[in-house]
Amino acid sequence: MSDIIDDFQKDVTINMQKCIDNFKININKIHVGRISPDILSFIKIEYYGVITPLCQLTNTVVEQPRTLIITVFDSSMIKFIEKAILESNLGCTPVSTGNTIRVTFPTLTESRRYSLIKMVRSESEKSKVLIRNIRRVSNDKLKTFLRNKEINKDNEHYFQNEIQNLTDIWIKKIILITKEKELELMKF
């Protein structure tokens, strides 16, 4: 029984950690005053039938605080890369010249900052819902364990409390990360 429960607890923790990791990745796409090539790291392009990360098809450097220069290795991919950047909802403008693409990001106005904060809060809520869904699925598994007599009623109650504690901890982390990102957005 203890092996089942140990594996179960590890799975719950791992799933909640993955949720937090994805949340961090998603809000790191939301840029503040400084731009880095990492802001494009999630963009993928179909290259000869294979979905390929942008970083494998290009070399990206920072030209100015709001401008990236992307050197494309295969010039036939320029239009596809421009399209992928435009569709990424980063609010930037790609302009190609030769085998390079210049990507300019807008300055952060107050209204743009507030819209970015709304995006961060939206991602935060999505992540909280995912954490709660993990809790719900986990509690359902506990009920199945109880029905199959793999655990008793006391163990079920104990592990439900443990799962609730984990849920509270991970949601607090999401709230903390959200507040940090909001402060970062308002600072620049």
Curated annotation (Swiss-Prot):
> GO annotations under biological process?
cytoplasmic translational termination
Mention any one GO cellular component term assigned to this protein in its UniProt record.
Answer: cytosol
Main subcellular location of this protein, as a coarse class = cytoplasm
The record's section on InterPro entries has: Ribosome_recyc_fac, Ribosome_recyc_fac_dom, RRF_sf
Locations listed in the record: Cytoplasm
- Which UniProt keyword terms apply here? Cytoplasm, Protein biosynthesis
Query: What GO molecular function terms would the record report?
Result: ribosomal large subunit binding
* Annotated family: Belongs to the RRF family.
Physiological role: Responsible for the release of ribosomes from messenger RNA at the termination of protein biosynthesis. May increase the efficiency of translation by recycling ribosomes from one round of translation to another.
Q: Under which name does UniProt file this protein?
A: Ribosome-recycling factor
Whose protein is this, by species?
Blochmanniella floridana
Q: What is the lineage of its organism?
A: Bacteria, Pseudomonadati, Pseudomonadota, Gammaproteobacteria, Enterobacterales
